[in-house]
Amino acid sequence: MLWVLYFLTSLFICSLIILWSKKSMLFVDNANKIQGFHHARTPRAGGLGIFLSFVLAYLLESFEAPFKGPFVFLGLSLVFLSGFLEDINLSLSPKIRLILQAVGVVCIISSTPLVVSDFSPLFSLPYFIAFLFAIFMLVGISNAINIIDGFNGLASGICAIALLVIHYIDPSSLSCLLAYMVLGFMVLNFPLGKIFLGDGGAYFLGLVCGISLLHLSLEQKISVFFGLNLMLYPVIEVLFSILRRKIKRQKATMPDNLHLHTLLFKFLQQRSLNYPNPLCTFILILCNLPFILISVLFRLNPYALIAISLVFIACYLIGYAYLNKQVCALEKRAF
């Protein structure tokens, strides 16, 4: 029944943040940002509730690999801090933020086995290259979750599903407790958006999911490609965003409002549908679920997982092209 404790702890801390923010305006978000799709000044420190619940679990539980040890806790804290500073309006440059995240990930990888070198049937890597690739993957998935954190419940919903799937595969993991911490936050976030996850929460959840999946891969409970498939939507979103900005000769770190979820939001909004923000989340998670469930069935079959990922990428590109065309056409008519 400890999951009840962590669920309520997360819910309680997030509730306190909402009340405190109304008085101090400390954690409130800027509704005028280019990637913003809300109007009210809303606290964006929901990740603090999840992280402090994790700290409580760290003190009360006997953590096993891959979350065992002070350096793992230090690394997770550094990655959370890299985003939380932004949440309290103490901005870091994208370069400094990435460096802080990389240092945190190195702390983790240096103290617990997370380096995957065998990517059969595609390739294998020497240990040093695999070590660097592990850093790239963990920093990458942390930022990927942050990129899709645009609407109520989207990033947290994807992570909650991932953590519950991980628990299904490995019931001995702590992923179930982490999932309930996320759900405690989601009570206040979805559908009405009383509080946002924030950069710190998004980075932390992305890293936790990445660590868990690499660990399961090394334990040979899943193919390494299953981890990719489980988080494929945020991964494709960040890679496609980088490619899109490179084509436009923009900085890869420059924010914009051309993500799949923002196009879907505009599409729903143009059709005057009620509650387009939570509806956008519901549609995207519903579209992801079939691919996740099929991947679970083939979690040890790399060939099937690669095929599933290619089908998902094709669906993503078709969906993106359709939404972009529809949104542009309707915007032209408006003028």
Residue spans for each PLM region:
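"…together with the soluble PPM/PP2C metallo-phosphatase catalytic core" -> "…together
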Residues: 1-239
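Cytosolic, membrane-interface loops and tails of multi-pass inner-membrane proteins
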Residues: 19-43, 240-275
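Select subsegments of transmembrane alpha-helices in polytopic membrane proteins
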Residues: 42-50, 202, 273-287
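Alpha-helical transmembrane segments and their membrane-interface junctions
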Residues: 56-61, 281-300
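Alpha-helical transmembrane segments and their immediate juxtamembrane interface regions
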Residues: 78-90, 94, 100, 301-335
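Membrane-interface starts of transmembrane alpha-helices
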Residues: 93-96, 126, 198, 275-283, ...
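Membrane-helix cytosolic exit motif
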Residues: 236-248, 318-327
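Hydrophobic alpha-helical segments
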Residues: 267, 271, 289-296, 300, ...
